[in-house]
């Protein structure tokens, strides 16, 4: 089957990009590719043949139909207007036409200088490229909307960050790379007609059912808000901290995008700050819901020329509804509840308070709870708590709540084990793979990718364990 590409963004939004080619790396080589995703997309195996060099994966060649562009956008960074940003090192190579008529962006990250590189060098480093590939695939297999990773190319090109590293490229796939920042760019340039063109593009290609509806713009923004609410709810339930929720890192389609200083909770700490550059804690774990709303408010402002204020406010209310509804549903599933009762939030908050006091591991606590039998408080989970009396008191209330459900233990445990992962991408696991890869050993990178494809499968090895002491002290930043 021949791959087919289109250039809808280039053809329909001429003011939003600069056309240019990728700049290849020195001695580029393919070190990993997503075989499962490649099969789903009918990508010929010959394209991954190392004897052909880095090929399209390293920006050395283009496939027929590709028309590469770097997109321009702006945004608020850490709550402050940052002005023009754009693809400073990424290039949208083209949009693959799929059998169902939809498209998939092929976006090459680390592809070299663009007009939007500002003071940057247009490169990505191997470390950050590996982290993004692992994180996006981990999120996908957890069932959370996300961009995908198709390939990684390493090289001998030196790249200076805090230390000297080597350049790499990531082929990132997504239904769209349209960001809140695209709309902000033209709003602050006082070009409302281009803001409306972006909205028209989004509706035409992603919500075509609304094209001929009078209230299409209001309906569209409501859906953007709802998708954002559901996405943030998913993040909170698995303990995912994005780390840098600038408006230019927010997807119109409600995808997790731009994995930088992310982290999954180890010890339960609602104030967890994954990004060591976030000195004020703006993007701490428990602030993500309010930051997402703030970002939606910035997007809403750009839409005021063609959506009434009341409609925008209704959409923002929809965000809150979607967030709270989806979060409540997910957390009840994590606790094994099939119905909703008025004291559920109190019971959950009591558990969170106990976990915070004890420094309980977020992922392992819920996974172990999913194996607990309601007839007995004696369990491996109980043994992880120092204050056994406090745990026993909570578990008695939890067990009483379970008895109100007409569901046997086996069915409850099955449900809980489908939503409480045994494995998440802990930073130390990613770092171990990075350390090996930087020495030329890709085995752990491949192995970790395979492990992350089965997050709900119990393991008795270190992939499912608490981090070692050195793994708790890892610092990550926006440097990539």
From Swiss-Prot:
Its cofactor is Mg(2+); Mn(2+). Belongs to the SELO family. This is Protein nucleotidyltransferase YdiU. It comes from Salmonella typhi. The keyword Repeat does not apply. One of its GO terms (molecular function) is magnesium ion binding. Disulfide bonds: none annotated. The active site is at 248 (proton acceptor). Nucleotidyltransferase involved in the post-translational modification of proteins. It can catalyze the addition of adenosine monophosphate (AMP) or uridine monophosphate (UMP) to a protein, resulting in modifications known as AMPylation and UMPylation. The gene is ydiU. It comes from the Bacteria. ATP binds at residues 86, 88-89, 109, 121-122, 172, 179, 258. It catalyses: L-seryl-[protein] + ATP = 3-O-(5'-adenylyl)-L-seryl-[protein] + diphosphate; L-threonyl-[protein] + ATP = 3-O-(5'-adenylyl)-L-threonyl-[protein] + diphosphate; L-tyrosyl-[protein] + ATP = O-(5'-adenylyl)-L-tyrosyl-[protein] + diphosphate; L-histidyl-[protein] + UTP = N(tele)-(5'-uridylyl)-L-histidyl-[protein] + diphosphate. InterPro entries: adnlytase_SelO, SelO. It is an enzyme of class 2 (transferase).
């Amino acid at each position: 089957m021949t791959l087919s590409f289109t250039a809808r963004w280039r053809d329909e939004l001429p003011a939003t990009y600069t056309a240019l080619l990728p700049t290849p790396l020195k001695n580029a080589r393919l070190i990993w590719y997503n075989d499962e995703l490649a099969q789903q997309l009918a990508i010929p195996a010959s394209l991954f043949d190392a004897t052909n060099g880095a090929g399209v994966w390293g920006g050395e060649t283009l496939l027929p139909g590709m028309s590469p562009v770097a997109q321009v956008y702006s945004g608020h960074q850490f709550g402050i207007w940052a002005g023009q940003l754009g693809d400073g090192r990424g290039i949208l190579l083209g949009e693959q036409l799929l059998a169902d008529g939809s498209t998939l962006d092929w976006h090459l990250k680390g592809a070299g200088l663009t007009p939007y590189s500002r003071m940057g060098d247009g490169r990505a480093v191997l470390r950050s490229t590996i982290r993004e590939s692992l994180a996006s695939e981990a999120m996908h297999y957890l069932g959370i909307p996300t961009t995908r990773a198709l390939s990684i190319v390493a090289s001998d090109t030196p790249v200076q960050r805090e230390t000297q590293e080597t350049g790499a490229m990531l082929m990132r796939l997504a239904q769209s790379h349209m960001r809140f920042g695209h709309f902000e760019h033209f709003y602050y340039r006082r070009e409302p007609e281009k803001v409306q063109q972006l909205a028209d593009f989004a509706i035409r290609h992603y919500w075509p059912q609304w094209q001929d509806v009078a209230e299409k713009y209001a309906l569209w923004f409501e859906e953007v808000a709802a998708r954002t609410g559901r996405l943030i709810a998913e993040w909170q339930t698995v303990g995912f901290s994005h780390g840098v929720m600038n408006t230019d890192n927010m997807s119109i389609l409600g995808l997790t995008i731009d994995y930088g200083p992310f982290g999954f909770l180890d010890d339960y700490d609602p104030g967890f700050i994954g990004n060591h550059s976030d000195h004020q804690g703006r993007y701490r774990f428990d602030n993500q819901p309010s930051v997402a709303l703030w970002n939606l408010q910035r997007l809403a402002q750009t839409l005021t020329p063609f959506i009434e204020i009341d409609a925008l406010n209704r959409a923002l209310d929809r965000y809150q509804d979607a967030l709270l509804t989806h979060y409540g549903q997910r957390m009840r599933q994590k606790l094994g509840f099939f119905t909703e009762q008025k004291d559920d939030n109190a019971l959950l908050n009591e558990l969170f308070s106990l976990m915070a006091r004890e420094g309980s591991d977020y992922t392992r606590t819920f996974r172990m709870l999913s194996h607990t039998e309601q007839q007995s408080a004696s369990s491996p989970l109980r043994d992880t708590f120092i204050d056994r009396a406090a745990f026993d008191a909570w578990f008695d209330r939890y067990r009483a709540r379970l008895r109100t459900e007409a569901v046997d233990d086996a069915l409850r445990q099955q449900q809980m084990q489908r939503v409480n992962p045994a494995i998440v991408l802990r930073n130390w696991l990613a770092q171990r793979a990075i350390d090996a890869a930087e020495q030329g050993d890709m085995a752990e990178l491949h192995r970790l990718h395979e492990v992350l494809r089965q997050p709900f499968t119990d393991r008795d090895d270190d992939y499912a364990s608490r981090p070692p002491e050195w793994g708790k002290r890892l610092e990550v930043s926006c440097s990539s």
